[in-house]
Amino acid sequence: MKVVIMAGGKGTRISSVASDIPKPMIKIEGIPVLEREIKCLKDQGFDDIIMTVSHLGNIIMDYFGDGSENSPATGKPFGVHIEYYFEKEPLGNAGALFKIKDKLTSDFLLLNADAMFDVDFNRFVAFHRKRDGLVTLFTHPNSHPYDSGLIVADKNGAVEKWLAKEDARPQYYRNRVNAGLHVINPKVLEISGIDADSVGKIGEDGKPVKVDLDRQLLKPLAGTGKMFCYDSPEYVKDMGTPERYYSVCSDYKEGRVSGKNLRNKQKALFLDRDGTINKYVGFLRNIDDFELIDGVAPAIQKINESGYLAIVVTNQPVIARGEVSFDELEEIHNKMETLLGKEGAYLDAI
């Protein structure tokens, strides 16, 4: 399976860390984050890579070459095959896909080059193939869902709604965010209605035609039954700001990055709900009665930072008693996730 890595961002938000190199070349413990991505892929058999580059892209191309040489950082072979598409003009974060579409003849992985991750990609791809959809999104909870795009899906993982940052959202929602890793069938490019030849050319508005991955290619598939989400607690973190970069550095040093890969056994804390997370009110039937216990969010935040999974296991007899429906219970849990997210905490599963 081919891997397309989007490495064309300017990284203006993280320029204080390194302004003279592309964001994917910023180092984590002496090795560029992009090299760590490539090693994670190569170790799992994904060694056929296309990189889309633009801003300072020559630095990336000079460093990795065609993937057949040794790493300047480690002295070890990259062990992959790399091709490049250089954007002379910005095409948006998905415009380059239309320029390389002849090379994309079957499902491919599409990844961002500026995220730190350690993921079981074979498990991810197997999920995609089992669902037989056009797209599978890698989704996870994060510590700031209030300013992130949210994915709403049914119980089978079919994406029903894609709520971008600017979209109106319900009062309470599940903390499920697109992590920027995707498996995509190239048919998505065909059905988008976008003319590949027009991308990069001057449009009717006098500006070059660009393509936005989320808004123009993926979001329109919500509700069609052709796009699914793959929920995973594995480590994927954007390094777009200095704060997040230093957080990633700390996580790597402490072993939290590799430790979250689902090829490894996981450490977890299982939490009761009533009286542990929310104030005990007996049989909780009304969503308005759900209130977090003071100090719970900071405590769960410490679990999130520890490398342990935070999983809620709760017995709800109000279901058996017919006093609360499954949909109403889900809304109560959405409130729990929303309130925790507002304080920077999240649950890996309920």
Where are these regions (language model features)?
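N-terminal nucleotide-binding beta1-loop-alpha1 segment
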Residues: 1-19, 263-274
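Conserved N-terminal catalytic core of the sugar/cofactor nucleotidyltransferase
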Residues: 2-5, 27, 31-116, 121-123, ...
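A short, N-terminal amphipathic alpha-helix
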Residues: 31-48, 296-307, 335-342
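Substrate-recognition element of Asp-dependent hydrolases with the DxDx(T/V) motif
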Residues: 52, 296, 300-336, 346-350
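A short, conserved acidic/glycine-rich loop-to-beta-strand motif
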Residues: 131-141
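Active-site neighborhood of HAD-like aspartate-dependent phosphohydrolases
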Residues: 265-311
